[in-house]
Amino acid sequence: MGGFFSSIFSSLFGTREMRILILGLDGAGKTTILYRLQVGEVVTTIPTIGFNVETVTYKNLKFQVWDLGGQTSIRPYWRCYYSNTDAVIYVVDSCDRDRIGISKSELVAMLEEEELRKAILVVFANKQDMEQAMTPSEMANSLGLPALKDRKWQIFKTSATKGTGLDEAMEWLVETLKSRQ
């Protein structure tokens, strides 16, 4: 009986915890983004070996956010975390032109997974504060995003260190998740 009332309460007040994965190649800024979202400031990070998991509350929605390491040796284990994922934040280093093809390959492989079929995709074109950064449009084309017909997606111009673009991206994600319920 208590479970019934708590589920009604949750549906009325939006307290269901959403599962979000933050994925991308190593050095893209995933961990910086996670802690910027959680504590609102830049924290010193080291390369993630394995994962970081934190609860982030944004606009009355609770997110269980999983930041998975992006090194070549860790990427095959991403699939172990796909189950019950509501959205993927895919972070791309806008300055890393040499690895945009690898980033695309990882993104395509991930999106082919059945467990992520219904997950919303948010791409963070990160490090936009750098002069040599690709534009979000250039990145979207390089990643093949316009070809995604059966998936809700959006790309945002972000800088994890400056905090720019994160609110817009999270606002879009929250509204998109709410419209699905």
From Swiss-Prot:
**What is a single Pfam family found in this protein's UniProt entry?**
Arf
Give the domain of life.
Eukaryota
Q: Which UniProt keywords apply?
A: Golgi apparatus, GTP-binding, Lipoprotein, Magnesium, Membrane, Metal-binding, Myristate, Nucleotide-binding
Lipid positions (N-myristoyl glycine): 2
Coiled-coil ranges (or none): none
Keyword Phosphoprotein assigned: no
Quick one: which residues bind Mg(2+)?
A: 31, 48
The answer to whether the entry has keyword Lipid biosynthesis is no
Topology relative to the lipid bilayer, per the entry, is:
Peripheral membrane protein; Lipid-anchor
Give the location in the cell.
Golgi apparatus membrane; Golgi apparatus, trans-Golgi network membrane; Membrane
Q: Where is the signal peptide?
A: none
InterPro entries on file: P-loop_NTPase, Small_GTP-bd, Small_GTPase_ARF, Small_GTPase_ARF/SAR
Q: Which residues bind GTP?
A: 24-31, 45-48, 70, 126-129, 160-161
- CC per GO annotation: cytoplasm; cytosol; Golgi apparatus; Golgi membrane; trans-Golgi network
Under Gene Ontology molecular function, one entry of this record is: GTPase activity
GO terms under biological process? Golgi organization; intracellular protein transport; protein localization to Golgi apparatus; retrograde transport, endosome to Golgi; toxin metabolic process; vesicle-mediated transport
**According to its UniProt record, which protein family does this protein belong to?**
Belongs to the small GTPase superfamily. Arf family.
Protein function: GTP-binding protein that recruits several effectors, such as golgins, arfaptins and Arf-GEFs to the trans-Golgi network, and modulates their functions at the Golgi complex. Plays thereby a role in a wide range of fundamental cellular processes, including cell polarity, innate immunity, or protein secretion mediated by arfaptins, which were shown to play a role in maintaining insulin secretion from pancreatic beta cells.
Q: Subunit comment for this entry?
A: The GTP-bound form interacts with GOLGA1. The GTP-bound form interacts with GOLGA4 and RGPD8. The GTP-bound form directly interacts with ARFIP2. Binds to SCOC, preferentially in its GTP-bound form. May interact with UNC119. Interacts with ARFIP1; this interaction directs ARFIP1 to the trans-Golgi membranes. Interacts with ARFGEF1 (via N-terminus).
Q: What is this protein called?
A: ADP-ribosylation factor-like protein 1
Give the organism the record lists: Bos taurus
